[in-house]
Swiss-Prot record:
This is FAS1 domain-containing protein fsc1. Glycans are attached at residues 89, 404, 501. It is a single-pass type I membrane protein. Gene3D superfamilies: FAS1 domain. The keyword Transmembrane helix applies. The chain crosses the membrane at residues 671-691.
Length: 728
């Protein structure tokens, strides 16, 4: 009896328990399909299960969980989700990431992720993007989790990488490699991890097409190919191997909810992708696997084509970063395939200090005129702001260092020094000298040190310059006096000239010595004494093939130019005809200054001898004054000088108007004086009229207004009446 009572009581308790726990989805059916069929809210899902032939699968297999969308999740009958993604082979939702029955092309299961409300603080658990509105609807064959929406498949890995700013560098590098794998676990460093390890130059190289193999190697340090590893797969530590055999360890601390890779915590984990998962890390894994070289750095700073040639022709130099050297590389737009690679390499290089230059020996061999094989030189200067110039005209636009190697990208290509004329033809400041060398056929001399005169010095010669241009024999003697046998470099800004006797190409021997100038001088000049004449060297060591050029600020003629030659060269032969007419040509070249006015043919016939004598100046007898570009003779008005020529035989001055006679001067002075006086009187009269008119009107107006301003007394009025009577 007691046993029967106990059984009856147990039955009653079980009945009450089931009654209290019952909800609208509860049923006594034994299969998942029967559960769904019992509720009209799943009619659309059942039709899709039937079309996809999944009904037998759900009826036949046990221990499954189906995430079942309500009819409201299918607003359009055309929506056909892959329902295998809604089925997982477990009834226990005891982990965040669950592998579904949907498989990738390599047969691995695509996962979904549960976001539990206890962790998120939401009202419902979520699976990917859908909310679980009713959980754990159980059947004998499995469990149904009712959801309010269609479950989105995980996005492709590249979509996640491109959408996150922190992944931008990894995305840019990996875009060519990630998509080729059906299953992959990615250990993605954030952008700061790259910036902490690599310089801008190194990143620029990695972004280039030349870095494909290096980038692939680096990316493969951060992906586990053909493996889908989620955090809860490694609650017990596991070791995984990359394709190159290097291994890493992974461990998930479930209590701390942290995933560790090589004992370093990830910043995020289990970001699901269609091909696997992304775990983010704050540092690179094995970054040292990539070795950077000078050739790679050249690519990073914009000289990729030069880098390719360097790697082909000088492979040992392209990878050596321990030797102290400089590599001068033209930028891509200035690159030429016929480039002399060795001329761009300098061993034992130190950059000159600001505002200094130095000559450096390059690696290229340059045969000279006598068959000697020497290394070609290159001239490198540094500007005040640290900018670098190569062979004067070429500028460095970017620089970088790797190990002991200095790399410079140039805006133009450089080549070994060319013959004199070819090398200097584009140097504007000595265009006169270069043209004269070409005209005289002097450009082919070898093993010569040239002191070339700047254009400004030639133009300062005035009429003498015209004489030289018209007399090539004289011009050649001048040019040869500034060309010395042998190559004499300064070597650098800090080197002094090696004083001594030097032989010119005209077989003269000159003493050349440096001139000391106080180093504390504010405007210190670079001076040389050549044959007792002081010159300022304005540019040192311009390199040419088999020679060197220094630019100087003036020219000294080895002879005296006659006044007659200067007058002829200036095109004023009428003045010579006038002198010849009066047999006065012998007065030229006597040391007297000659002022040459502009004359016509008729002037030669009409002017008298006094006119000619007036323009040949004896400074001891006449007052001759020059001020700037004007002259005056015997206190005459200033006359503008149009051109001039200086010579030991006498200077020549070209003017437009003739020097006036003393009588003309007196009349001119008188006229100017009278004109000045009349002008002064006129101004005074005008001022008086203006003054009188203004103040008279002012006083009259005041007198007229006075009765209105103040009433007069009776005596005053009477006096005014009397005065009026008298005036009538």
């Amino acid at each position: 009896m007691n046993l029967q009572f106990r059984l009856y009581l147990l039955f009653i308790l079980l009945f009450i328990s089931f009654a209290n726990g019952k909800n609208e989805y509860e049923d006594k059916s034994t299969s998942i399909i029967d559960l769904l069929s019992s509720k009209s809210q799943f009619s659309k899902l059942i039709r899709r299960l039937q079309r996809n032939r999944l009904v037998p699968y759900l009826n036949r297999n046990k221990g499954l969980t189906l995430f079942a969308p309500l009819n409201e999740a299918f607003p359009d009958d055309s929506i056909e989700p892959n329902l295998l993604y809604y089925i997982v082979n477990t009834t226990e939702l005891d982990r965040s990431v669950l592998r579904t029955q949907l498989k990738s092309s390599d047969g691995q299961q695509i996962a979904l992720k549960i976001h539990y409300k206890a962790e998120t603080g939401r009202a419902y658990d979520k699976v990917n993007n859908a909310q679980i509105v009713q959980s754990n609807w159980r059947a004998d064959s499995g469990v149904v989790q009712v959801i309010d929406n269609i479950i989105d498949l995980p996005p492709p890995a590249l979509e996640i990488l491109s959408s996150e700013k922190d992944f931008s560098i990894f995305h840019r590098l990996s875009v060519a490699w990630v998509g080729e794998y059906s299953s992959v676990t990615m250990l993605v460093p954030d952008s700061s991890a790259f910036l902490n390890v690599y310089t801008n130059t190194e990143l620029a190289y990695l972004y280039s097409m030349y870095a494909a193999e290096d980038v692939k190697t680096l990316i493969h340090q951060h992906i586990l190919v053909n493996q889908r590893v989620y955090a809860e797969d490694v609650i017990e530590p596991k070791t995984f191997h990359y394709k190159n055999g290097i291994s890493i360890s992974m461990k998930f601390d479930k209590d701390q909810k942290k995933l560790f890779i090589n004992d370093v915590s990830t910043t995020k984990y289990d970001l699901l992708t269609f091909s696997g998962a992304i775990h983010t890390v704050s540092s690179l894994i094995n970054p040292e696997i990539i070795s950077f070289t000078p050739a790679k750095y050249l690519i990073g700073i914009g000289a990729a084509w030069f880098s390719e040639k360097l790697s082909r022709e000088r492979k040992s130099i392209s990878v050596d970063k321990t030797s102290k050297r400089a590599i001068l590389a033209p930028t891509n737009w200035a690159y030429r395939e016929i480039i002399d690679i060795d001329y761009h390499i300098i061993e034992n290089f130190d950059l000159p200090a600001p505002n200094k230059y130095a000559l450096y020996v390059t690696n290229i061999k340059s045969g000279n005129s006598v068959g000697e094989d020497t290394n070609a030189l290159v001239r490198i200067a540094t500007g005040s702001a640290g900018e670098m110039y190569v062979n004067v005209e070429t500028r460095s636009i970017q620089s970088e260092n790797i190990g002991n190697v200095s790399l410079y990208v140039l805006d133009k290509d450089i080549e070994p020094p060319q013959p004199l004329l070819s090398q200097l033809i584009l140097v504007d400041e000595i265009s006169f000298s270069v043209r004269y060398l070409a005209s005289l056929g002097l450009g082919d001399y070898t093993k010569v040190t040239w002191f070339l005169v700047k254009n400004s010095a030639w133009t300062q010669l005035g009429l003498v310059h015209l004489v030289l241009q018209q007399n090539l024999e004289l011009l050649e003697s001048v040019m040869l006096d500034y060309a010395f046998e042998g190559i004499a470099f300064y070597g650098s800004s800090d080197e002094a000239w090696a004083s001594g006797n030097y032989t010119t190409l005209s077989n003269k021997e000159f003493l050349i010595e440096g001139v000391y100038e106080d180093s504390n001088s504010r405007n210190k000049r670079d001076l040389l004494r050549i044959n007792n004449e002081i010159y300022e060297v304005q540019t040192r060591d311009l390199l040419v093939k088999d020679g060197v050029v220094h630019l100087v600020d003036k020219v000294k003629l080895p002879f005296s130019v006659s006044q007659k030659d200067m007058i002829i060269a200036g095109g004023r032969k009428e003045f010579l005809e006038l002198l010849d007419k009066f047999e006065m040509l012998d007065m030229l070249d006597s040391g007297y200054p000659v002022v040459v006015p502009s004359l016509t043919g008729s002037d030669v016939n009409t002017k008298d001898s006094s006119f000619a004598e007036r323009h040949i100046i004896d400074p001891e007898k006449r007052n001759f004054v020059i001020s700037g570009s004007r002259l005056s003779v015997d206190s005459s008005p200033w006359i503008s000088i149009q051109d001039y020529g200086y010579s030991e035989l006498g200077n020549v001055y070209f003017v437009q108007n003739a020097i006036p006679t003393k009588r003309q001067n007196r009349w001119r002075i008188t006229f100017i004086s009278i004109s000045g006086l009349l002008l002064s009187v006129g101004i005074c009269v005008l001022c008086y009229k203006i003054y009188f008119k203004f103040f008279r009107n002012r006083f009259m107006n005041q007198g007229e207004r006075e009765p209105l301003l103040a009433p007069a007394d009776s005596d005053t009025m009477a006096g005014r009446r009397n005065s009026s009577s008298l005036s009538v």
